[in-house]
From Swiss-Prot:
Reported modifications of this chain: Insulin-stimulated phosphorylation by AKT family kinases stimulates SLC2A4/GLUT4 translocation.
Official protein name in the record: TBC1 domain family member 1
Molecular-function annotations in GO: GTPase activator activity
Main subcellular location: nucleus
Annotated positions of the Phosphoserine modification: 146, 232, 234, 500, 504, 522, 524, 562-563, 567-568, 582, 611, 624, 692, 938
Keyword terms, alphabetized: GTPase activation, Nucleus, Phosphoprotein
Length: 1165
């Protein structure tokens, strides 16, 4: 019986599915890359015209097959029904990525035609317009939709999955973050880095010596000590240099300390910006991974597993290396400040040596150069107002939708703008082709215009490029103009505009209530728009550091009726109200100034014209800024109320005056044209600060009349404060609880992600219960468990979620049974302290991070949490064990440990495996122990599997060709994780000889398959590729064989045999004096190492002897004590026995007297 199958309809392109469409290719035409959508119908018409002119031998349309998929858009010729498609004969017409389809157009007059404009990667190359015809016009929308969907999916894939070039290009370096410096210019002298370092050391010393003084409070004149240094830089613009470094105190989380290089007046202009990188305390980890990408640099903290700083190349303006401190470097970048501007900050870092700094500087230079070239190549071509194609674009927009006659008139008008020669040429070319009708004539004219404008576009220089130098000069001249003269002219023009506008509004007001209603709903009119346009060529917006140098009185503006103005009276308000106008105010956005009608009583013009240095206050959205007095305010309120009451009655629509028509024509369209940022919804009004009663805002808000707020008593204010404080405390508690829940959830997800592998020996519930009972034993770290019981438990299986805890338990049992370490232990340096240092092995570690378990989800993310934790472990061990440092293969060992436990616990277990279990010997730089291990494996094969050994020797295959990764990575680089985890179970139980037993069992169980291969390549490929893909049954069989095998004595014998053979070969071989001397020196060094090892073993043996002797003495002492106790007990026993006998005799005598009354009773004497 066949199984039941069904197919479900899926979304297009779920898994790179290609959709084919049978079409007719009408033709193609190369056009300029700046071709716009209005031009495209005329291009299609030209393609169809050229296709209709083709001869009978070469038909105009070709049957093609259009293949659409997210990976590519391909057009191939259709061979026909009788022929089979052959890729050697039928090559594709074009092939491109779907995101390169720039425009798609569907012909509305003839729905069976559509066209696509394919844009080339290079900006200077031409685009190609392909025109297709479908046999069924109803399929055209489906084809267009499929192409758009394919392009959308392809673009999403590009954003979701970065290219491989990004990962390979990014270079990572470990650096130590020293601090950040606020500077006043984007460039700096070469000695900046050295001065920063000296300033950091001075700041650190000053802060530690005087911790009682607040870090943010500058010292007084009497307390001011000597400055760290004072230097006048010759580079212009570098006026001040301020150090900022953050520390941590017992009472303060972080604080900032400023120390200036310049005179005392510079302290008023210290740059205060947001500290993006929170520099940690000296007691915290300040090491970072400095990563250089294609277009940005970023700092990753391995401690927090987060990006601490990310800067684009555009924001970096200066990079330098220290002159005296050659192991330091830094860069200056732009950062945004709280006021909307920006300032410049220099970040300083330290490396391990000068060579690493040189490499970083070279990498930065290359990255900047490549990014600049790519940015220039990828810059999109744009049209300026003077572009020839811009004129053609506007012409096509004008004639769009016109009939042939009107289009012909527009084209004739446009031709008059050309030169006589160009007009004559176009006229002659059109007459040569003899168009049948006006439409064909129009198409020909557009075609020749397009060719003419495309030729002009090739030699055209954009307006922005021409005026670039002149604009810079004009900006410089404009910035040097006196601000007072500019403000005086601006005030005069504003007053004139205000008077003319007021007169217009008064006439409108007198016309009736209908005009009043229209004015209330119209958009605002910016009084300064014409003025700002007139002064746009002579004024310039100041740059970031120029803004910061402005005094506070010139850069800050206060609104009328704000909280600062409540304390002032009406008279002082009139005199103090105008504020200084900044150059930036001329370019501000339009503000709502017509939400209500101005007062009839105009303020005297001399108030504004009297002082040329003052002007109107800055306008704000939904605020009406004026300079009226409180008395004028009352008059206005009464009149406004009267007008609002009168406006509720219906009024007949009357004809507007010429001033009203001008006003409505100017003001009304602004409401529809303004950007959405300008007109925000009324929900934002609730977040605005409360306005003063003096402020002339509209009385009727969007939600009705605004009630006047009452002044609250102190008791009510106190209750509000208490309520707010309690709510804040509750919110903080809830936030902490949410963070705890989120952290626990992340830990569970992280643990589940780590243990994402298949177990080889699934644990039964009984076995899991046994392990849980063992792990829950109180004081288990001091209790010795039975070895047979532990062997049995490990043999039955280890639960995956308890594996890390079980490994720690087995390590504790090893330390209990071996109280004296068999080898010299490393320094007891805390893990956190090791992470604060820089390692010289960073390059090798960073390279191997991507190679370690690349398919596992925990390590697959580039510089994710898994890779950063693994980097920390390997870095800490390289600093702890200077002799070994880092060796390839250690990343796999540490990676397996990290999957089953935390970061610091994995580091401790790595130390246990390396020093206590003896794995450290095989990672030494000389690799002598690894050679001995290869010899031992060969001898095991010779003794246990002779035929396999002979087969491998026949093809000259030594163990180093296939077994070296097994020993260095403990099978983790080639075998499944479940199998490797079981190998680690046995290593923690039995030691490093487990690796030999597993290798011997694997080769022995696959011996028949290996013997079938008859050459070196196939044998090695089978051992490396096929053999690791074991089945579950074969893996369990291998593990059970390892538990039953004991080869410890053979391994010791083979090691001694290796050393004997090495000495014999050295003595027997005829060598020259130099060679003999070299070998003798090598032998001497190896013998010294052996002597050191023997001395270590001797020390261990002496320690064991001393411990045994001490144990014997303790036992003898306890034995003598026990003997004395036994003797005392025996004496006590004899005394008790005598007492019992006496009691028995007395009892017998008493019994006999009671039975015979004639016997005299014993006297009471």
């Amino acid at each position: 019986m066949e199984p039941i199958t069904f197919t479900a309809r899926k979304h297009p392109f779920p898994n790179e599915v290609s959709v084919d469409f049978g079409l007719q290719l009408v033709g193609s035409l190369p056009v300029h890359s700046l071709t716009t959508m209005p031009m495209l119908p005329w291009v299609v018409a030209e393609v169809r015209r050229l296709s209709g002119q083709s001869s009978k031998k070469e038909p105009g349309t070709k049957p093609v097959r259009l293949c659409v998929s997210p990976s590519g858009l391909r057009c191939e010729p259709e061979p026909g029904k009788s022929q089979q498609w052959d890729p050697l004969i039928c090559s594709s017409i074009f092939e491109c990525k779907p995101q390169r389809v720039h425009k798609l157009i569907h012909n509305s007059h003839d729905p069976s035609y559509f066209a696509c404009l394919i844009k080339n990667d290079a900006a200077n190359q031409q685009s190609i317009c392909y025109v297709f015809k479908a046999d069924d016009q109803t399929k055209v929308p489906e084809i267009i939709s499929s192409i758009r969907q394919a392009g959308k999916i392809a673009r999403q894939e590009e954003l979701r999955c970065p290219s491989e070039f990004d990962d390979t290009f990014a270079k990572k370096f470990e650096v130590l973050f020293c601090g950040r410096v606020a500077v006043a210019h984007r460039k700096a002298p070469p000695a900046l880095i050295d001065e920063c370092i000296e300033g950091f050391s001075h700041v650190s010393g000053g802060f530690s010596s005087d911790q009682s003084r607040s870090a943010l409070q500058p010292p007084g004149d009497g307390e001011r000590g000597p400055r760290p240094m004072r230097k006048s830089f010759s580079q212009p613009g570098l006026r001040s240099l301020a150090f900022r470094k953050e520390f941590q105190d017992a009472g303060l989380r972080s604080s900032s300390f400023f120390s200036s290089f310049e005179e005392s007046d510079i302290e008023n202009h210290l740059i205060s910006g947001h500290n993006i990188v929170q520099p940690t305390d000296i007691e915290e980890n300040r090491t970072m991974l400095f990563t250089i990408g294609q277009s940005e640099v970023y700092l990753i903290s391995p401690d927090t597993k987060k990006i601490a700083l990310q800067k684009n190349f555009k924001e970096i303006s200066f990079c330098s290396q220290g002159i005296r401190h050659v192991d330091h470097f830094g860069f200056i970048c732009r950062e945004s400040s709280g006021g909307g501007g920006f300032h410049f900050v220099c970040y300083v870092f330290q490396c391990t040596n000068e060579a690493l700094v040189d490499e970083i500087m070279m990498t930065l230079k290359q990255a900047f150069t490549v990014a600049a070239v790519q940015q220039t190549a990828k810059a999109p071509a744009q049209l300026c107002e003077g572009c020839p194609l811009q004129g053609l674009h506007k012409l096509c927009e004008r004639i769009e939708g016109m009939n042939s006659s009107k289009t012909k008139l527009e084209l004739q008008k446009h031709l008059t703008t050309l030169t006589n020669q160009e007009q004559a040429t176009i006229f002659e070319e059109v007459q040569k082709l003899r168009p049948r009708n006006e439409q064909r004539e129009n198409e020909l004219i557009i075609s020749f215009l397009r060719c003419l404008y495309e030729e002009k576009q090739k030699v055209h220089i954009h307006i922005g490029e021409i005026k670039q130098t002149s604009q810079i000069a004009a900006e410089n001249i404009g910035s040097e103009l006196p601000s007072s003269a500019t403000r005086f002219r601006l005030d005069m023009l504003k007053n004139k505009a205000k008077r003319s506008l007021t007169e217009s509004l008064e006439s409108i007001l007198s016309r009736g209530n209908k005009a009043r209603g229209l004015q209330e709903h119209s958009a605002s009119l910016d009084l300064d728009s014409s003025v700002s346009s007139m002064f746009s060529n002579t004024s310039k917006e100041p740059s970031g550091y120029e803004k910061e140098a402005l005094p506070i009185s010139e850069s800050c503006f206060r609104l009328l009726g704000s909280s600062d103005d409540l304390s002032s009276d009406s008279e002082s308000q009139l005199t103090e109200e105008p504020a200084l106008l900044s150059p930036k105010q001329g370019f501000r956005r339009r503000a709502n100034t017509l939400s209500h009608v101005p007062v009839e009583c105009q303020e005297p013009p001399q108030l504004v014209r009297g002082s040329p240095g003052v002007s109107q206050r800055k306008l704000v959205r939904y605020h009406s800024v004026s300079t009226e007095t409180p008395h004028e305010r009352k008059d206005f309120e009464s009149k406004a109320d009267h007008i609002s009451d009168a406006s509720r009655t219906p009024v007949k629509t009357r004809r507007h005056s010429w001033r009203q028509q001008i006003f409505l024509r100017v003001a009304t369209p602004q409401k529809a044209c303004e950007s959405p940022k300008r007109y925000e919804d009324y929900s934002e009004l609730g977040e605005l600060p409360p306005r003063s009663p003096l402020e002339p805002v509209c009385e009727d808000g969007p939600f009705g009349p605004v009630p006047e707020e009452k002044k609250r008593t102190s008791h009510e204010l106190r209750e509000l404060w208490q309520k707010a404080i309690l709510q804040q405390i509750l919110l903080l508690r809830m936030e902490k609880e949410n963070q705890k829940l989120q952290a626990s959830e992340n830990d569970l997800l992280n643990k589940r992600l780590k243990l994402d592998y298949e177990e080889i020996t699934p644990c039964l519930k009984e076995v899991t219960t046994v392990w849980e009972k063992i792990l829950s034993t109180p004081g288990r770290s001091k209790i010795k468990f039975d070895m047979e019981k532990m062997h049995s438990a490990v043999g039955q299986g280890v639960p995956r979620h308890h594996r890390g805890e079980i490994w720690k338990f087995l390590a504790e049992q090893y330390h209990l049974k071996h109280p004296f370490p068999c080898k010299q232990q490393p320094k007891d340096t805390p893990y956190k302290e090791l992470l604060k240092q820089l390692t010289s092995q960073q390059h090798a570690i960073l390279i191997d991070l991507g190679r370690t378990f690349p398919t596992h989800p925990y390590y697959s993310a580039q510089l994710g949490a898994g890779q950063l934790s693994l980097y920390n472990i390997l870095k800490a061990y390289s600093l702890l064990d200077q002799e070994v440092g880092y060796c390839q293969g250690l990343s796999f060992v540490a990676g397996i440990l990290l999957l089953h436990m935390g970061e610091e616990e994995a580091f401790n277990m790595l130390k246990f495996l390396m020093f206590d279990m003896g794995l450290r010997k095989q990672y030494r730089p000389d690799m002598i122990i690894l050679q001995i291990q290869m010899y031992q494996l060969s001898r095991l094969l010779h003794d246990y599997h002779r035929d396999l050994y002979n087969h491998l020797e026949e093809h000259e295959i030594g163990p180093s060709l296939y077994a070296a990764p097994w020993f260095l990575t403990v099978f983790a680089s080639q075998f499944p994780l479940g199998f490797v985890a079981r190998v680690f179970d046995m290593i923690f139980l039995q030691g490093s000889e487990v690796i030999f037993k597993v290798a011997l069992s694997l080769l022995g169980s696959h011996k028949p398959l290996i013997l079938q291969h008859e050459n070196l390549e196939t044998i090695v490929d089978f051992i490396k590729s096929t053999l690791p893909n074991l089945g579950l049954v074969q893996m369990e069989k291998t593990i059970s064989q390892v538990f039953e095998t004991d080869i410890s004595k053979q391994l010791q014998a083979y090691e001694v045999e290796y050393h004997v053979l090495q000495e014999e070969l050295i003595d027997s071989s005829p060598l020259s004096d130099n060679q003999r001397m070299d070998k003798l020196e090598k032998t001497n060094s190896s013998l010294r190492k052996q002597n050191l090892d023997l001395l270590e073993q001797l020390q261990v043996a002496n320690g064991r002897i001393q411990s045994l002797e001490a144990t014997v003495e303790k036992l003898l002492t306890s034995e003598s004590k026990l003997k004395q106790a036994t003797l005392a007990l025996e004496l006590e026993r004899s005394a008790l026995l005598q007492t019992v006998e006496q009691l028995r005799r007395q009892t017998a005598e008493l019994g006999s007297q009671e039975s015979d009354p004639t016997l005299p009773k014993p006297s009471g004497d």
